[in-house]
Amino acid sequence: MIIIGEKINGSIPSVARAIAERDADHIRNLAKIQSEAGADFIDVCASVKDGELETLHWLIDLVQEVTDTPICVDSPDARVCVEAMKFCKKPGLVNSVSMEGDKCDVIFPAIAGTPWQVVALLCGKGIPKSAADRLNVFDQLMEKAKAYGIPASKIHIDPLVEMLCTSEDGIAMVTEVIAAVKEKQPSIHVTGAVSNISFNLPVRKLLNQAFLVLAMNAGMDSAVMDPTNRDMMGMMYATEAMLGLDEYCMEYIGAYREGLFGPQKP
């Protein structure tokens, strides 16, 4: 499972304050604890009205002061993403492209022929309401990727995880899309913002864990989540073992010994 740490995001009130006050220690700490908890990428999203690129530069520099975990450059503006890639000391992940506007034509050329990976959202001008429509967007994205020489193995498809409380069929459509994407392109990654599922609902951690298990069972192998949440990490390792993705439970045992989940050791 590829873990994309979600905690450095300006849409989170405490992070927004840290950005406004230029509280470097707060940002460094968020980077450090996510890296130590097992994040494979650290998502960095400024989420500011003005000066987004400058803010991303500041955030990325702070993250790189305390960890060499690759950066996930996160912005709704494709051109900002491409410029922010230049601040990273090593290739990471770009979040994101979609069929909206010219995003593919801006980001795909920037990562072509490099080790950079990319998150691709299954949407265009709006969010498709059916699995068939989302899979149609998937086909369009893959045609674009092929045209720019981007292999499927560098793409993390986001099927668009929406709030459970407004869903008519639970997560049935999302899991259908995940399974279909993996069937069409076995080497592609499927990701998603796990915590989206529980928005506006009580005891969110239970819903997040339940979603993670069901999505992984459908084929999701990447997730935007909080790696410092020990219960979530434990559930992830346990699910990998149950699905036969962890030979002899070696990853599960290793993560437990490292203290990534289970009772905290003194």
What residue ranges belong to the model's regions?
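Active-site mouth loops of central-metabolism enzymes
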Residues: 3-29, 93-99, 125-133, 197-205
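Alpha-helix-loop-beta-strand connector modules within alpha/beta enzyme cores
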Residues: 6, 52-89, 172-192
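Active-site-proximal loop/turn and secondary-structure-junction residues that shape catalytic pockets
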Residues: 8-10, 46-50, 77-79, 98-100, ...
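Glycine-rich, proline-tolerant flexible connector loops at the mouths of alpha/beta enzymes
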Residues: 35-69, 161-171
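Catalytic beta/alpha-barrel core
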Residues: 43-48, 69-77, 91-102, 119-122, ...
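Catalytic alpha/beta core domains of metabolic enzymes, predominantly
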Residues: 106, 113-261
